[in-house]
């Protein structure tokens, strides 16, 4: 008999089986957005779902989901304290500015899949993305996707909700297509501006020729180097 089952991020299949056998299921979420959280299985009483995204936590909690809890992401300080800090480490990693993360510029990313959409809809989506980049503290991407716009996107890149899911196409398109494009634009613009004045190192998977003054170091090992 197991005392509990633990996973990083949430699995509907694990929750279903834990619920069947009355075993507590603890899931620690580190991705946002995470589509599996819109499975109806998150209401299973066996669940203890810990989210670091306070906005998503409140959205679910205020929606009557009582199996979610807010918890900031943790760090193993003991492991970090054991990492050596010598001259070689400083030579490799020191920089005025460093950024670790995806630039969302992988070939065939979600927004690129809309390249064959009508000029009107493409112009509308580009304008929405541009507007969102200039407004902080409010995310309106999902609100401005009208049924006609959703229909046009569906014709190019259809989306069918999971059988156990309650997510809407507007949620998926707003958060996985448009929001990622907003993030991509912002990261390129910020790194371009910063690298004009400071030594800037970028740790990411893909080349960034659009940022000639940024030192792209490729991916970094999260365990050995961070």
Residue ranges and their predicted role:
Residues 1-62, 79-85, 216-226:
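Extended catalytic core of nucleotide-activated donor transferases of GT-like folds
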